[in-house]
C-alpha cells in the first residue's frame, strides 16, 4: 500500500503550486517595499495594491532614477485612468529595453497574481541581478556560467569555499540555514558562533542568519524561514542572495581591488558591434530575439514552478551569445576586388566560406586561359566536389539527429540531477574550443586556396576554348551559390551546433583539396608554355568583370529601394495594429466590468435563495410548535369539561330548592321582559343596518384591491411569456451574428483599400452605437418618469387612506367622551342602588318567589354555555385547518419559486455551455488557419526548390557563351524579383490572415460582451421582478393595515352598541326602582307582619351563607376559565406572528412583481435594440451597394489602364522594329567594309558594342512587357475571385430566407403552447369556482355562530342582573362586596367576548378578500383570452404577408439563378480565353528565345572577326588551331571566310522573318484584347442587373433610408442643403470658370471628371464642393463658426475651399476617399493665373 493514487498526486501538485505562489508573493512584496520605503510608501498585498499604477510608477522611478512616470499619472478613481497609468509604466519598461510578454495593464488591475509576479521578477533581474554582473566581486567566476541561478551559485561557492559545504542547487541546499549563516559569518564572525550550529535545527539557523544580516549588515529579512523549510522556492532564495554582493563589495573592497578580472562579457559584445557586414547585423538581430525568447520563457513559466526554474537555470546572457555570434559573422567580410584579395592575405579573411570560393575562382578564371583538354579534368573535379557535398549533407543530417538525441538526454538529466549542469558548462567550453580550432583550420584552407589560385594563374588556354572554360566556371559559381543558399537557409539559432559539423566537413574537404593540388601541379607543368598568348585576352576579361560589377551595384541599389518601401509599409501596418490593440483593450475593459457585475448579481441571487430556504425551515419549525401547543390545549379543554359537569350537578340540586321561591317573581318579570324585548328588537334592527352598510363599504374596497392584485399577476404571466420569447430571440440573434461573421470573413478577402474604407465605416458605426446608447438612456429616463408617476399615484392613494384614518381617530375620541359620560351616570346609579337596599328588606318575601325563576334561567344559561363551548371548539378546529391549508399553500408557492430559480440557473448554465462551445469552434478555426499558413510555407519551400532546379537546368543549358551567361543572369534577377514578389505576397497573405484572425477574435469578444450584456439584462430583470414583488408585498401590508383600521372602527362601533345596551340596562333598573316603590306601599300595609319576617330573616341568613359558599365555588371556576382564556390569547398572538411572517412573504412576492415589471421594460429595450440592429443590417446592405459602385469604378479605371498599357506596348514594339531595321542597315554596311578593308573592322567593333547595349536594353523592355502581361492575368484572377465572393453573399441571403421560415414555424409552435396554457387556465378557473362555493358555505356557518354568541351574551347579562337582585336581600356590607366582584367579572367577560368577536370578524374579512381575489383572477383570465385571440388574428395576418414575401423572394431567386448560370458560362469563357493567351505567350517566349540565340551567334561571329582583325599573324594562328585536324590550305581559308559571311547574311534574313512573326503576334493580341473588352462589357451589364435586383429586395424588405452615398449625377443635388440666393459677384465667377473649363477640356475628359453647378453658386467636382468668390464674403465666416460649434450636418464628407483670409479652410479626412481621379482636373481648374481667390487644403 505504499503506492499513491493519481488523485492524491494531483492534490499534492495543486498544493505545491499554491505554496510556491504564496512564497514568491511574500518575497516580492518585501523586495518592493525595500525601495518604496524611501518615499514612505508600502505594498500590503501585491495582488491588489498595483491596480491604479501609482505604486508601480514610483517603484520604477526609484529603481531607474528617472522621475518621468508619476508626472503623467492621474489619481482618479475610474478603471480607464488606472489602465492609462499602468500603460505609462509598461511603456517605460519597454523603453528601458525590457520586454513583457502576456502582461497587460488589465491583468494588473484585475489582480492576475502570476503575471504580476513575472513582472516583478523581470525588474529583479534587470535592476538587481544584472547590475551585480558589472560589479568587481561578481565577475570572478563568470567565464563558465552566465545564467542568473548559476551565477549566484558560483558566487556563493567562491565565497564559502572554506566552510566545506557541497552546494547543489538554490532550493534544498539552503533548507538547513547553514549556508545563510556562513555568508553572514564571513562578514561578521564576532556576531555569530558558526561552530555551535547544527543541521537539525534548520528553523533556528534561518532565523538567526536573517536577524543578524538585518541588524549588522542592513540586509532586510525578505524570506520566511517556514516557507524555506516547507517549500523552498528558487526565485525567492535567489532574490535574497542577490542582496549580499553589494555588502561584500563594500566590506571586502581592498581585497578585490588586487584581483585583475578579465572582461570576458564586454569583449564579445564589442566584437559584435564592430563587424560591418550584413551577416553580422542578422546575427545581432537574432541574438536579441534569443534574449526576448528567454524573457518570454521566464514570464510564462511562472505558471508552474518546475518549468519556471528550468527556464531560469538554462537561459543565456546576451554577452555569451555575442561571443558566439562573432564567430559566424567573421565569415562574411566584404571583398572589394579579386586583385586585393590575393594581396591582403590572411588578415582580411577570418573564416573561409563558399562565397569566397566563388570570387576566388572568378579571379583565377579571369587571369588565366585553360586549354580545352584540361577542361575535362576540371569537370571531373567538379563532379567529385558535388559528390563530396552530397556526402557532407548526409553526414550533416546524421550529426544533427545525433545532436537532437543528445539534447533530449541532456534535458532528461537536467530534471533528474542538478550536478549535470556543470557537465553542460564543460560542453559549452569544448564547443568554444572547437570553434577556435575551426577558425584556425578555415585560415589554413584559405591559404591553400590562395596557393591554388597562384598556381591556376599560371595555366593558359588557347583563344578557341575560352568560352567553354568560362561556361564551366559559371556552372561552378552557380552550384556553389546554391550551397550558399542552403547554408543561409540553416536557422541562426542552430549555427552554434552546426559549426562543429562544418569543421569536421572542412577537414575532409582538405584531404580532397590535397588530391586536387596534385592534379593542378601536373596541369602547371603542361601549360607553362601558353602563358604569353593569354596576355592579350586579359584586358577583355577585365572589362567584362567591370561591367558585371556595375550591374551588381545597380541591383544592390534596387534592393535597397525595395527594402525602404517595405519598411514604410511595415510602419503603416504597425500603426494600424496599435490602433486595433487600443480598441481591443477598451473592449476587454468593458468585458471585465460586465463579468464582475454578472458575478455580483449571481452571488446576490444565491444569497436570496439561501435566505428563502432558511425562512421555509423556520416556518416549518413554528408550525410544528403550534401543533404541539394545540394538542396541549385539547387536553386542558377535556379537564375543564369534567369540572363543568360537576358544577352542573351541584347547580341542579340548588335549582330544585329555589324553584318555590322564584315562582312569584317570574310573573312580575314577564311583563317587564316583554317591554324590554320590544325595545331590544328595534335597536337590533338599527344595528344590523349599520353593520350591513359597513360591510358593503369594506367589500368594495377589498374588491378593488383584489382587482389590482389580479392585474399584476396577469402582468407577471405576460412577462414570463416574453422572457421565453426573448430567449428564442437571443438564440436567433446569435445565429445572425454567426452569419454576419461569415460575411465579414468573405469581405475581408478583398483588397487593402477596401479594408481601409471598411475601417472608416466602422468608426462611423461606433458613433452610431454611441447614438443608440444615448437613445437607450433616454428610453430609460422615460421609463423612470413613468415609474415616478406611478409612485405619485400611490402616494395620493396613501394620503387618502391617511385622511380616512384621521377621521376614524376623531370618531374614537368622540366614543371615549361618551364612555366618560356613561361612567358618571353609573356612579349616580350606584347611589340610587344604595337607597334601594333599604327598601329591599321589605321585599324579601317576594324575592323568594323570584329566586325560583332565576334558578330556571341559570339552568338555561349553563346549557347555552355548553353549546358555546362546543362551538368554540369547532371554530378552533376550523381555524387550525385553515392555518394548515395556508401553510401548505405557502410551501407550494415556495417550491414553485425554487423551481423557477432552478430553471433560471439551468438557462444560465446552458448559455455558458454555448459560449464554451463557441470558443472551441473558434479554436478549431484558428488551428485550421494555422494549418493553411503552414501549407503556404511548404509551398514557398517547394517554390524555392523548384527555383534551385531551374538554376541547375539553366546552368546545364548555358555552357556555350559569355553572352548566354549575361542574359541568364538577367533572367535570374527577374526570377529573384518574382520570388521577392511572391514572398511579399505571401507575407501580405499572412498579414491578412492575422488581420482576419484578429477580426474573428474581436467578433468573438463582441459576442462574449453581448452574451454578458444579455446575462446582465436578465439579472436586472430578476432584480426588477424582486422589486415588483416587494412593492406588491408593501401594497398587501397597506391593505392589511387598512383592514386592521377598519376592524378597530368596527370594534369602536361595537363598543358604542354595548354602551347603548348598558343604558338599556339602566333603564331596566329604573323600572325596577319604580316597582320597589310600589312594593314600599305594600310594605306599609304589611308592617303588622314584622315578627313573621324576622323569623324569615333568620332563615334567609342561613340560606345566604350557603349561597356565598356556592358563589365562591363559581368564582373559582371563573378564575380558572380566565386562565384558560389567557392561554388562548397567547396562542392567538402566536398565530398573529405567523400572519406577520406571511405578510413578509407577501412583501417578497411584491418585490418579485417589481422585478417582472423591470423585465417588461428590459424586453421593450431589447425590442428597440433589435430594431436598431435591423437598421444596422440595412446600413450594411447600403454599404454593400456602395462597395459595388466603387468596384465598378475600379474596374473602369483598370480597363483604361489596360488600354494605355496596350498602346505603350505597341509603341515599344514599333520602336523595336525600327531599331532592328537600323541594325540591318548597319550590318550591311559592315559587310561591305569587311570585304573592302581589314582596318575598318576596329571601328565596326566599337559600333557593334554600342548596339549590343541597345539590344540588351530592348530585351529588358521586353521582359517588362511580359511582367505587365502577368500582372494583367493576376488582375483577371482577382476579378474572378470577386465574382465568387458575390455568389457566396447570395448564398448567405438564401440562408437568411430559410431562417425566416424556421422562425415562422417556431412562432406557430409557441401559439400552440399558448393554447394549451389557456386550457390549463380554464381548468384552474373551474377549480377556483368550486373553492369559492365551499368558502361561501363556511362564511354562512360562521355568521350563524356569531349571532348565537351575541344572544348568549345578552342572556348572560340578564342572568347576572337576577343574581344581583338576589344578593340585595342580604345585608348592606355583603351587597357592596358582591357588587364590586360582579362588576369586575362583567368587565372581564365583556373583554373576552369582544376579543373572540374580533377574531371571527378578521377571519371573515380574510375570506372575503380571497373571494375578491378569485373574482379578479377570473376577470384577468378573460382579458388574457381576448388578447390571445387578437394575437392569433395578428399572426394570421403576418402569415399571409410572409407567404406573399416568399413568393416574391422565389421569383427573385429564380432570376438570380439565371444570372448566376450566365455568369458561370462567362467565367468558363474567360478561362478559355486565358488559356489561349497563355499559349500565345508561350509561343512568343519561344520565338524570343530563338531570336536571342540568333543574336548570340551573330555576336560570337563578330567576336571572332574582331580577333582576326588584331593582326594577320594572330588570325592565321587562330585559323591553324581551328583547322589543325583538317590541315586546310590557303584556298580553303578563303572558303571558310566566305562561309562566315554567308552565315551573317542568313542571320539578317532570319531577323526579318522574326519581325514579321512579331507583327503577326501583335495582331493576334489585339484581337484577343477586343474579345476581352466585349466580355467585360457583358459582365458589367450583368452586374448592373444584379444591383437592380438587390435594390428591389431592399425596397421590399426595408424602408428607404435617408442617407445617400456621394455620387456624381445631378439628381443627388436634391439631397443637398436648401439653396441660398446667389452672391453679387456670381456672374464674373461663372464667366471665369467657364473659360478655365474650355481651356482644359482634354484633361477633364482623360480624367473623367464630373462637374456640376448648384443653385446657390457652389461647384461640385467629383462629389467635392467648392465655393468661390472674388470679394471677402461673410458666408464663409458663418460656415466656419457653424462647423466649429458642431453644426456641421450639411457639410460632412466634403472639402470646402473658402476665399477670406481670416477664416480657416474646413477639411474632413473622409473626403480624401472620394477625391479619386479628380485631383488633376481640380489642379488645372484652380491653378490658372485668373484672379480667383481660394485656399487649397493642407
From Swiss-Prot:
Keyword tags: Actin-binding, Coiled coil, Cytoplasm, Cytoskeleton, Developmental protein, Endoplasmic reticulum, Golgi apparatus, Membrane, Nucleus, Repeat, Transmembrane, Transmembrane helix
Residue span of region Disordered: 285-350, 1068-1090, 1589-1627
Effect of loss of the gene: Cells have reduced efficiency in fruiting body formation and reduced spore viability.
Induction: Up-regulated by cAMP.
Ranges in coiled-coil conformation: 373-1598
Primary location class: nucleus
Residue ranges of every copy of the Calponin-homology (CH) domain listed in the record: 22-128, 146-249
Keyword Repeat set for record: yes
S-S bonds: none
Chain intervals with Polar residues compositional bias: 302-316
Bias (Low complexity) ranges: 292-301, 317-344, 1068-1086, 1589-1617
Cytoplasmic compartment residues: 1-1705
A GO biological-process term: spore germination
GO cellular component, one term: centrosome
Keyword Manganese belongs to the record: no
Gene3D superfamilies: Calponin-like domain
Domain of life: Eukaryota
Family according to the record: Belongs to the alpha-actinin family.
Function: May function as linker between cellular membranes and the actin cytoskeleton. Required for normal development of fruiting bodies.
Protein's UniProt name: Interaptin
Origin species: Dictyostelium discoideum
Name of the gene this protein is made from: abpD
Amino acid at each position: 500500500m505504499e503506492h499513491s493514487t493519481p488523485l492524491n498526486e494531483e492534490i499534492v501538485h495543486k498544493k505545491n503550486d499554491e505554496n510556491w505562489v504564496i512564497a514568491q508573493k511574500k518575497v516580492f512584496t518585501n523586495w518592493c517595499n525595500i525601495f518604496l520605503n524611501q518615499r514612505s510608501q508600502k505594498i500590503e498585498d501585491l495582488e491588489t495594491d498595483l491596480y491604479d499604477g501609482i505604486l508601480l510608477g514610483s517603484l520604477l522611478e526609484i529603481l531607474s532614477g528617472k522621475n518621468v512616470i508619476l508626472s503623467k499619472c492621474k489619481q482618479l478613481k475610474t478603471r480607464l485612468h488606472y489602465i492609462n497609468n499602468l500603460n505609462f509604466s509598461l511603456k517605460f519598461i519597454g523603453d528601458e529595453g525590457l520586454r513583457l510578454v502576456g502582461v497587460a495593464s488589465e491583468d494588473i488591475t484585475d489582480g492576475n497574481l502570476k503575471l504580476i509576479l513575472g513582472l516583478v521578477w523581470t525588474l529583479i533581474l534587470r535592476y538587481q541581478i544584472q547590475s551585480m554582473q558589472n560589479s568587481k566581486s561578481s565577475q570572478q567566476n563568470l567565464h563558465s556560467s552566465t545564467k542568473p541561478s548559476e551565477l549566484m551559485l558560483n558566487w556563493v561557492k567562491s565565497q564559502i569555499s572554506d566552510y566545506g559545504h557541497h552546494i547543489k542547487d538554490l532550493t534544498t541546499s539552503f533548507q538547513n540555514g547553514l549556508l545563510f549563516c556562513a555568508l553572514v559569518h564571513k562578514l561578521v564572525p564576532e556576531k555569530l558562533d558558526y561552530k555551535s550550529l547544527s543541521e537539525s535545527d534548520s528553523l533556528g539557523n534561518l532565523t538567526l542568519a536573517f536577524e543578524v544580516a538585518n541588524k549588522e549588515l542592513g540586509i532586510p529579512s525578505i524570506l520566511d524561514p517556514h516557507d524555506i523549510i516547507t517549500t523552498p522556492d528558487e526565485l525567492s532564495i535567489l532574490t535574497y542572495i542577490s542582496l549580499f554582493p553589494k555588502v561584500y563589495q563594500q566590506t571586502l573592497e581592498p581585497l578585490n581591488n588586487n584581483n585583475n578580472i578579465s572582461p570576458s562579457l564586454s569583449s564579445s559584445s564589442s566584437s559584435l558591434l564592430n563587424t560591418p557586414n550584413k551577416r553580422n547585423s542578422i546575427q545581432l538581430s537574432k541574438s536579441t530575439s534569443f534574449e526576448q525568447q528567454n524573457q518570454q520563457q521566464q514570464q510564462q513559466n511562472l505558471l508552474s514552478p518546475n518549468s519556471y526554474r528550468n527556464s531560469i537555470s538554462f537561459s543565456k546572457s546576451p554577452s555569451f551569445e555575442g561571443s558566439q555570434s562573432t564567430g559566424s559573422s567573421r565569415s562574411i567580410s566584404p571583398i572589394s576586388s579579386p586583385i586585393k584579395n590575393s594581396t591582403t592575405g590572411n588578415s582580411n579573411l577570418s573564416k573561409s566560406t563558399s562565397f569566397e570560393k566563388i570570387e576566388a575562382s572568378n579571379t583565377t578564371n579571369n587571369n588565366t586561359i585553360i586549354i580545352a583538354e584540361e577542361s575535362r579534368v576540371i569537370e571531373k573535379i567538379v563532379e567529385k566536389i558535388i559528390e563530396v557535398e552530397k556526402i557532407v549533407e548526409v553526414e550533416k543530417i546524421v550529426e544533427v539527429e545525433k545532436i537532437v538525441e543528445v539534447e533530449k538526454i541532456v534535458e532528461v538529466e537536467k530534471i533528474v540531477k542538478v550536478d549535470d549542469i556543470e557537465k553542460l558548462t564543460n560542453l559549452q567550453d569544448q564547443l568554444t574550443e572547437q570553434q577556435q580550432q575551426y577558425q584556425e583550420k578555415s585560415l589554413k584552407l584559405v591559404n591553400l586556396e590562395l596557393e591554388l589560385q597562384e598556381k591556376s594563374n599560371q595555366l593558359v588556354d588557347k583563344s578557341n576554348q575560352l568560352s567553354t572554360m568560362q561556361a564551366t566556371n559559371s556552372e561552378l559559381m552557380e552550384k556553389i551559390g546554391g550551397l550558399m543558399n542552403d547554408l543561409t537557409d540553416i536557422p541562426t539559432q542552430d549555427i552554434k551546433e552546426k559549426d562543429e559539423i562544418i569543421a569536421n566537413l572542412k577537414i575532409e574537404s582538405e584531404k580532397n583539396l590535397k588530391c586536387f593540388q596534385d592534379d593542378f601541379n601536373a596541369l602547371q607543368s603542361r601549360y607553362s608554355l601558353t602563358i604569353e598568348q593569354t596576355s592579350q585576352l586579359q584586358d577583355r576579361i577585365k572589362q567584362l568583370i567591370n561591367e558585371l560589377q556595375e550591374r551588381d551595384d545597380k541591383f544592390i541599389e534596387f534592393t535597397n529601394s525595395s527594402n525602404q518601401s517595405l519598411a514604410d509599409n511595415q510602419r503603416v501596418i504597425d500603426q494600424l495594429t496599435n490602433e486595433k490593440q487600443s480598441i481591443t483593450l477598451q473592449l476587454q475593459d468593458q468585458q471585465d466590468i460586465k463579468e464582475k457585475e454578472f458575478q455580483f448579481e449571481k452571488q446576490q441571487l444565491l444569497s436570496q435563495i439561501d435566505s428563502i430556504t432558511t425562512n421555509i425551515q423556520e416556518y416549518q419549525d413554528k408550525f410544528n410548535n403550534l401543533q404541539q401547543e394545540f394538542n396541549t390545549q385539547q387536553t386542558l379543554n377535556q379537564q375543564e369539561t369534567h369540572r363543568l359537569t360537576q358544577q352542573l350537578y351541584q347547580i341542579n340540586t340548588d335549582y330544585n330548592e329555589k324553584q318555590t321561591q322564584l315562582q312569584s317573581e317570574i310573573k312580575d318579570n314577564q311583563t317587564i321582559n316583554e317591554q324590554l324585548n320590544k325595545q331590544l328588537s328595534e335597536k337590533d334592527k338599527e344595528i344590523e343596518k349599520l353593520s350591513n352598510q359597513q360591510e358593503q363599504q369594506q367589500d368594495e374596497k377589498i374588491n378593488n384591491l383584489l382587482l389590482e392584485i389580479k392585474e399584476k399577476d396577469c402582468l407577471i404571466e405576460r412577462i414570463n411569456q416574453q422572457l421565453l420569447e426573448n430567449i428564442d430571440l437571443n438564440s436567433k440573434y446569435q445565429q445572425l451574428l454567426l452569419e454576419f461573421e461569415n460575411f465579414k470573413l468573405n469581405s475581408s478577402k478583398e483588397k487593402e483599400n477596401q479594408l481601409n474604407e471598411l475601417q472608416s465605416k466602422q468608426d462611423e458605426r461606433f458613433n452610431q452605437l454611441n447614438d443608440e446608447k444615448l437613445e437607450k438612456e433616454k428610453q430609460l429616463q422615460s421609463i423612470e418618469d413613468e415609474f415616478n408617476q406611478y409612485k405619485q399615484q400611490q402616494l395620493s392613494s396613501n394620503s387618502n387612506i391617511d385622511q380616512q384614518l384621521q377621521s376614524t381617530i376623531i370618531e374614537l375620541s368622540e366614543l371615549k367622551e361618551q364612555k366618560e359620560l356613561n361612567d358618571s351616570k353609573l356612579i349616580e346609579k350606584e347611589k340610587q342602588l344604595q337607597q334601594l337596599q333599604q327598601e329591599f328588606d321589605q321585599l324579601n318575601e317576594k324575592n323568594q318567589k323570584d329566586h325560583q325563576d332565576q334558578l330556571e334561567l341559570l339552568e338555561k344559561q349553563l346549557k347555552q354555555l355548553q353549546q358555546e363551548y362546543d362551538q368554540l371548539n369547532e371554530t378552533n378546529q376550523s381555524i387550525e385547518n385553515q392555518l394548515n391549508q395556508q401553510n401548505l399553500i405557502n410551501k407550494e408557492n415556495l417550491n414553485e419559486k425554487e423551481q423557477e430559480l432552478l430553471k433560471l440557473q439551468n438557462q444560465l448554465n446552458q448559455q455558458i455551455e454555448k459560449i464554451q462551445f463557441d470558443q472551441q469552434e473558434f479554436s478549431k478555426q484558428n488551428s485550421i488557419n494555422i494549418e493553411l499558413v503552414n501549407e503556404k510555407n511548404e509551398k514557398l519551400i517547394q517554390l524555392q526548390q523548384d527555383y534551385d532546379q531551374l538554376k541547375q537546368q539553366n546552368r546545364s543549358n548555358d555552357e556555350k557563351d559569355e553572352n548566354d551567361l549575361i542574359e541568364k543572369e538577367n533572367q535570374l534577377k527577374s526570377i529573384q524579383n518574382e520570388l521577392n514578389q511572391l514572398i511579399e505576397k505571401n507575407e501580405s497573405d499572412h498579414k491578412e490572415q492575422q488581420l482576419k484572425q484578429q477580426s474573428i477574435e474581436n467578433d468573438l469578444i463582441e459576442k462574449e460582451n453581448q452574451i454578458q450584456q444579455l446575462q446582465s439584462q436578465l439579472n436586472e430583470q430578476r432584480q426588477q421582478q424582486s422589486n415588483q414583488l416587494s412593492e406588491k408585498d408593501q401594497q398587501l401590508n397597506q391593505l392589511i393595515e387598512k383592514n386592521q383600521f377598519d376592524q378597530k372602527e368596527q370594534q369602536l362601533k361595537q363598543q358604542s352598541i354595548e354602551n347603548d345596551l348598558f343604558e338599556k340596562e339602566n333603564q331596566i333598573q329604573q323600572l325596577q326602582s319604580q316597582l320597589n316603590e310600589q312594593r314600599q306601599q305594600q310594605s306599609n300595609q304589611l308592617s303588622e307582619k314584622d315578627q313573621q319576617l324576622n323569623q324569615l330573616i333568620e332563615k334567609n341568613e342561613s340560606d345566604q351563607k350557603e349561597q356565598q359558599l356556592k358563589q365562591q365555588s363559581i368564582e373559582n371556576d371563573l378564575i380558572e376559565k380566565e386562565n384558560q382564556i389567557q392561554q388562548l390569547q397567547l396562542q392567538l398572538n402566536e398565530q398573529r406572528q405567523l400572519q406577520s411572517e406571511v405578510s413578509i412573504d407577501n412583501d417578497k412576492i411584491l418585490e418579485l412583481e417589481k422585478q417582472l415589471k423591470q423585465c417588461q421594460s428590459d424586453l421593450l429595450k431589447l425590442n428597440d435594440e433589435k430594431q436598431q440592429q435591423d437598421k444596422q443590417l440595412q446600413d450594411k446592405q447600403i454599404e454593400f451597394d456602395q462597395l459595388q459602385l466603387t468596384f465598378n469604378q475600379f474596374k473602369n479605371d483598370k480597363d483604361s489602364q489596360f488600354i494605355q498599357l496596350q498602346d505603350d506596348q505597341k509603341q515599344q514594339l514599333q520602336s523595336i522594329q525600327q531599331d532592328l531595321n537600323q541594325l540591318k542597315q548597319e550590318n550591311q554596311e559592315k559587310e561591305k567594309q569587311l570585304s573592302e578593308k581589314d582596318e575598318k573592322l576596329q571601328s565596326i567593333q566599337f559600333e557593334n558594342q554600342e548596339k549590343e547595349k541597345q539590344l540588351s536594353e530592348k530585351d529588358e523592355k521586353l521582359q517588362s512587357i511580359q511582367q505587365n502581361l502577368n500582372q494583367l492575368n493576376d488582375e483577371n484572377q482577382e476579378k474572378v475571385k470577386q465574382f465568387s465572393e458575390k455568389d457566396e453573399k447570395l448564398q448567405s441571403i438564401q440562408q437568411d430566407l430559410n431562417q425566416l421560415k424556421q422562425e415562422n414555424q417556431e412562432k406557430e409552435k409557441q401559439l400552440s403552447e399558448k393554447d394549451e396554457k389557456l386550457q390549463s387556465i380554464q381548468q384552474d378557473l373551474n377549480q377556483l369556482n368550486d373553492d369559492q362555493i365551499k368558502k361561501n358555505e363556511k362564511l354562512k356557518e360562521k355568521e350563524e355562530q356569531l349571532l348565537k354568541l351575541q344572544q348568549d351574551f345578552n342572556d348572560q347579562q340578564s342572568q347576572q342582573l337576577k343574581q344581583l337582585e338576589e344578593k340585595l336581600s342580604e345585608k348592606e356590607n355583603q351587597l357592596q362586596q358582591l357588587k364590586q366582584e360582579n362588576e369586575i367579572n362583567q368587565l372581564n367577560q365583556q373583554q373576552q367576548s369582544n376579543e373572540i368577536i374580533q377574531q371571527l370578524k378578521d377571519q371573515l374579512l380574510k375570506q372575503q378578500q380571497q373571494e375578491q381575489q378569485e373574482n379578479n383572477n377570473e376577470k384577468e383570465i378573460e382579458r388574457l383570452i381576448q388578447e390571445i385571440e387578437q394575437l392569433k388574428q395578428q399572426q394570421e395576418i403576418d402569415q399571409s404577408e410572409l407567404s406573399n414575401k416568399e413568393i416574391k423572394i422565389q421569383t427573385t431567386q429564380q432570376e438570380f439563378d439565371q444570372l448566376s448560370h450566365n455568369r458561370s458560362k462567362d467565367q468558363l469563357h474567360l478561362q478559355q480565353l486565358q488559356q489561349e493567351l497563355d499559349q500565345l505567350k508561350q509561343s512568343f517566349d519561344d520565338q524570343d528565345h530563338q531570336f536571342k540565340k540568333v543574336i548570340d551567334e551573330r555576336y560570337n561571329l563578330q567576336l571572332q572577326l574582331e580577333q582576326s582583325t588584331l593582326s594577320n599573324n594572330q588570325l592565321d594562328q587562330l585559323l591553324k588551331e581551328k583547322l589543325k585536324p583538317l590541315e586546310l590550305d590557303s584556298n580553303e581559308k578563303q572558303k571558310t571566310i566566305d562561309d562566315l559571311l554567308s552565315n551573317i547574311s542568313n542571320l539578317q534574313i532570319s531577323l526579318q522573318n522574326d519581325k514579321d512573326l512579331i507583327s503577326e503576334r501583335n495582331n493576334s493580341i489585339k484581337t484577343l484584347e477586343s474579345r476581352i473588352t466585349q466580355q467585360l462589357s457583358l459582365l458589367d451589364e450583368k452586374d448592373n442587373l444584379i444591383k437592380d435586383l438587390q435594390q428591389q429586395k431592399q425596397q421590399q424588405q426595408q424602408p428607404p433610408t435617408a442617407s445617400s452615398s456621394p455620387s456624381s449625377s445631378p439628381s443627388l443635388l436634391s439631397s443637398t442643403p436648401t439653396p441660398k440666393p446667389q452672391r453679387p459677384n456670381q456672374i464674373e465667377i461663372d464667366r471665369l470658370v467657364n473659360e478655365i473649363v474650355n481651356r482644359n477640356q482634354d484633361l477633364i475628359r482623360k480624367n473623367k471628371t464630373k462637374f456640376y453647378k448648384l443653385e446657390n453658386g457652389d461647384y461640385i467636382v467629383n462629389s467635392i464642393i467648392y465655393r468661390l468668390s472674388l470679394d471677402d464674403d461673410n458666408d464663409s465666416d458663418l460656415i466656419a463658426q457653424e462647423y466649429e460649434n458642431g453644426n456641421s450636418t450639411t457639410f460632412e464628407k466634403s472639402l470646402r475651399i473658402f476665399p477670406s483670409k481670416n477664416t480657416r479652410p474646413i477639411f474632413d479626412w473622409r473626403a480624401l476617399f472620394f477625391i479619386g481621379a479628380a485631383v488633376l482636373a481640380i489642379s488645372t481648374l484652380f491653378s490658372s493665373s485668373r484672379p480667383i481667390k481660394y485656399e487649397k487644403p493642407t
